[in-house]
Amino acid sequence: MVFFSAIATNTTKGDFFMRLKESAKEFGSLKSLVAMAMLLALRLALGFVTTIQVTENLKIGFTIFPTTVACMLFGPVAGAVMGGTADILGLMLKPTGPFFPGYTLDSMVAGFIYGYSFYKREKLTAVRVALTLATVTVLVNLCMTTSWICIQYGVKDFSLFFSDSAAAWQSFFAKFRAIFGGRAIKNACLYPVNTIGVYFLLNAVRRVPVLREYMKRGGTRA
């Protein structure tokens, strides 16, 4: 993705794996686990209270805010684990349909991207936040989630990806086009709101003395 490449321009291969290693170490801290649990609970609560189901295939929510805070504090590995856990627990506590692993993968990928982009950064600029959210919007929300909706309510399983049937793929793309427009409009409307909100929220959190000292532990990187 062009978007994510732009925010990772100055990142070396060693730095990438170092971030993964440091994020994984967060699970060894009791304070980190407690904070993760609190942010996970907040994400679930916001998901139950603020989510608006517009249509069967379209809903609006604000879980992005506790999600990005958690990812900034604990990194890509923790972000992916928390994303998957939140999706599964949310479905268990408030079922909205059958379990579908594609949506869990969406939450994990989004958490990984947020965590990698925001974790232990010396600065969180508006450009970094905007490009990160653009990456998640295009890759996860528009491409991946739309594909899962087509599979869940179309071919019913993942066999499509192993099929050479032209008719099956034509049916998939027809459904994809049918629901893509509405999802694109929704994401285009929410993108500036989410970007502005996440930028100011994360930078406000970074100014909290206790959290500022916590994030300095182990150092920051550009």
Residue map of PLM features:
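Loop-helix junctions at membrane interfaces
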Residues: V2-A222
